[in-house]
Structures are given as C-alpha cells and as structure tokens.
UniProtKB/Swiss-Prot annotation:
It is found in: Cytoplasm; Nucleus. This is Protein sds23. GO terms for molecular function: protein serine/threonine phosphatase inhibitor activity. It holds the Pfam family CBS. Belongs to the SDS23 family. Signal peptide: none annotated. Its main location: cytoplasm. Residues 462-482 have a biased composition (Basic and acidic residues). GO terms for biological process: cellular response to glucose starvation; regulation of mitotic metaphase/anaphase transition.
Length: 482
C-alpha cells in the first residue's frame, strides 16, 4: 500500500496558451530517423535521473496566476465562447487526401483534430479527423483490421491504394474508426452546459455562432480542465475540492487496460482501437507502470523509414517517444503519467495539465519485477537506422532486447490498480455544482462496443496472449494474462 501522504496542492500554470497559427502550405515532415542526424543528444546529459523523475512526480510545474478578467465571476455563467479562438480550427475537405490531412493534423498541434467540410467555402463541419482515425487507417493498411462482410472489398481497396501510393480521400477514411457524432454548443452557452456534456464522457465540443452551424472554436476537455485549474482561486466551489485525496473522492475506475512492454507495438495499436481508447498503460511483468502509449504517438509511424517500429516492442517504442520528445525539447524527458490513491485532486489535475494527458494511471506501491536491470540511459536506447539511397526500409532492422522493467517508470511508479480521466474529473465538478451528467462509464462502454467490430475477429481469441487487464478491486489480485 502506498504511504498515506497527502500532497500539498501544487502550484498552477499560466492561463496563456500558445496560438497555433500555421502556414497554409504544409511542409514536408521529416521522419524520426532523419531528425536523428541533427540530434544534439550526444552533447546533453544522457538521461533524466530517477531523482529528477521523482521530483516531477511530487512537484508539478509552477504557477503564474489566473486571468483577472474571470476573478469574482461564477464559472457556471462564463460563456463557452470566451475560452475558444478561431486559430484552433484547421479545415480539410472530404476530398482532401489522407496524406495531406495527416500532415495537417501533425503540424496543427492541440486540440489535435482537423475539422472536415464538404467544400472549401463551408464553415460547417460534417466530420472530423484525429489520431484515432489515423490509427484505424494504419490498421487497415497493415491488414490488421477486419470489416463487416459488406465492407470487405472497400477495406481491401483502401489497403491496395495505400500500397500503390494512390490518393485516398478523407471521405473513405473517416468511417473506419467508430466514434460518436459531433457535439456542438452555441458560443453564448454557459460553461455549466459544457461541463455537464464533458462529464458525461464527450471529449470535444464544436463552438458555433448563435443560431448557426458556423464553427468559431473548439473546446476540449483538457482546455476546460486547464481553465478551471489555472483560475481555481476565482471559483471557490471547485477550488475547495483540490486538497481532497483521490481515495476520498471515490472517482475514476478500478478497471484499467494495459499491455506488457515486451509485446509488439502493433498489439498496442490494435488494443487501443479495439477498446476505443486514446492511450494505454505499458506495464512490466509485475504490473508496474513503465510508460504510456497514445494514439497521438502514431505520428511517429507516418514515414516509410519508421515502418520497422511496427515490429518492435512497446518498450522500444516508448524509448523512441522519449528520444523524439528530447529532440524537440532539447532535453531528455520522462513524463509521469501516474498518481496514487493518496494523491490530491490538485496533484492529479496539475499532472494532467502539465503532460497534456487525458488520463492518469492509479498505482500502488511498486511490486518486485523479475530480472529488473538497472535503469538504462536513454542515450543508449537503440534508434531506427536511417535508410540509405532511395529511402527504402532497412531489410533487417534490429531492436534491442530491452525488458519492460528497464525504463525509469518501473522503479518509481507502482502496480497499476485503476485509472482517472478528464471525464471523471469533469463529472465530479458537474455533480458538485448540482448538474446531472451521465455516467462517463456508459460512454466508454459504447465506444468499446462500436470499436470491437472493426478489428480482426481472431484478435478476441488471442487477446489473452498479450493483454494485461488490470482489475484493481481492493483486496483482489492482479489479473496478469500472458
């Protein structure tokens, strides 16, 4: 059992958010392997030390104060239009090819979605394209998705076109991932309505001009949680919840789905699609959390030279994610995606905001892991070889035999016992404020039911061969399926 330590509420981040203004033309995105040639890693400290990771675990980043224009206002009466900006909107059309849309998605950044319209003159969204769609498309191209009998020819044609590098319009891709309909709100609606919707399990709201379907902004769960966190001192009803520990709030779920770090990355991609998840925990043989893989990480798989990664282990892919983040940030990075039952809500929200995550894994004290080697330096992690000549995929890529226990997370996290999501937190805020959100678990169940039909049927029968399903009911043992 974790120590009964109540963390003081960590300080808050600034409310200012960077603008995502991007040039109209989408530049060529070099592959991860190409970027490695300019990596300054050899001139940096080789890795984030365990002490530094523990410091991040205990003390998320510092605050710069809330926005004074919201001081003294009832958050429930703030209009949703006050939290969004048109610069967050990025459009593609139904006939835009998926390659262009993928580049736009990667380069646009948060809120990590491209809105789709019928013609370039429309300001009404008919659908969306995000990393869940990209993951579903990737599975089709790899032959790991299995459609209904009536769709077999369509899926086969898509895979064939992809192999031939033929243009594939978004209209042929956006139906691959099962998802809920677009949710819209007028910009004049109060935040109470948005909190109620988000607390019911909806992840994204399109904000429209009053009385129209003209989109003027995108409000995400993360943006709203960050707003309420940064301005918490102005909203006492919510601020008073932050010092409470998770165990006493009784939020989240004691059922979390994870994958062993030694399993193939393709298994993780299938698992996320099959379960309707945007991310999964990666664990070692003792169910200790060692990392996190999300559908957003599929952006590292969009170049031909990255294809060997698909046959690598999840733990190797995590090392690639950390290396890529280090190249972008100029330092090694090991984001902490876990909390414990005695973490405060403030501590949990601060981590969600700092890591831009949708969920935190709930862990208890670490379990001994068989054959756990010393934590390796990330500088020594194997990387994808840069292809020579025409840029073809190396015929025999080699990947290190790195155990799931080798990353820093295996030593400082703990045994996975549950998960807490942005939906859970916003559901708490809604209920505390007298609103009536739906149970977010019902929304999760719907996504999983609708997603399960899109994967190869044989996956269900072999699921136990690679899936670790962690059921953290108090007093029960961990169900480690091997």
């Amino acid at each position: 059992m974790a120590d009964r330590t109540v963390f003081d509420p960590p300080p808050r981040q600034s409310t200012s958010s960077p603008s995502n203004n991007n040039p109209a033309s989408i530049a060529h995105r070099s592959s991860f392997a190409e970027n490695l040639r300019q990596s300054p890693r050899a001139h940096r400290h080789p890795s984030f030390t365990q002490a530094a990771v523990q410091e991040l675990l205990n003390h998320p980043p510092a605050q710069k104060g809330g926005d004074p224009k919201f001081a003294g206002r009832d958050w429930r009466q703030i209009h949703v239009g006050e939290l969004v900006q048109e610069s967050d909107i990025h459009w593609c059309e139904l006939d835009t090819d998926v390659e262009h849309a993928t580049k736009a998605l990667i380069e646009s950044g948060p809120p990590n979605v491209i809105l789709i319209r019928e013609t370039p003159n429309d300001l009404t969204a008919c659908d969306s394209f995000d990393y869940n769609d990209l993951n579903a498309y990737l599975l089709v191209v790899l032959g790991l998705a299995s459609p209904d009998e009536a769709q077999t020819d369509t899926y086969s044609q898509l895979a064939s076109k992809a192999r031939e590098h033929a243009p594939i319009p978004l209209r042929d891709v956006i139906t691959l991932a099962k998802k809920e309909p677009l949710t819209t709100l007028s910009q004049s609606e109060d935040l109470s309505k948005a909190v109620e919707i988000f607390g019911s399990g909806v992840h994204r709201i399109l904000v429209c001009k009053p009385g129209t379907t003209t989109v003027v902004g995108i409000l995400s769960q993360l943006k709203l949680v960050k707003f309420l966190w940064d301005n918490g001192s102005s909203f006492p009803a919510i601020d008073q919840l932050y010092p409470t520990i998770l165990r006493d709030l009784n939020i989240g779920t004691q059922h979390a789905i994870a994958i062993n770090g030694d399993k193939l990355l393709t298994d993780a991609l299938q698992l996320m699609s099959n379960e309707g998840l945007t991310s999964i925990a990666v664990v070692d043989n003792a169910a200790n959390v060692v990392g996190n893989i999300s559908t957003a990480d599929t952006k590292l798989l969009t170049h031909t030279s990255s294809l060997p990664l698909l046959q690598s282990s999840c733990i190797h892919f995590i090392s690639v994610i950390l290396s890529e983040r280090g190249i972008g940030d100029g330092k090694d990075s090991f984001p902490v995606f876990h909390v414990n039952p005695y973490s405060t809500l403030a501590h949990t929200v601060a981590k969600l905001v700092a890591t831009r995550s949708h969920r935190m894994w709930v862990v208890e004290s670490a379990s001994p892991s068989p054959s756990a080697p010393a934590t390796p330096s990330l500088a020594h992690a194997s990387v994808v070889q840069q292809p020579s000549g025409s840029g073809s995929v190396p015929p025999s890529p080699s990947f290190p035999a790195v155990s799931a226990a080798a990353l820093p997370g295996a030593r400082i996290s703990g045994r996975l016992t549950g998960v807490i999501t942005l939906s859970d937190i916003l559901n708490l805020f809604a209920r505390t404020s007298g609103l009536n959100p739906l149970n977010p678990n019902e929304s999760r169940a719907r996504r999983r039911r609708s997603s399960s039909a899109s994967l190869r049927p044989s996956m269900d029968s072999s699921r136990g061969d690679y899936l670790d399903t962690i059921r953290g009911e108090r007093g029960s043992s961990v169900d480690n399926r091997k």
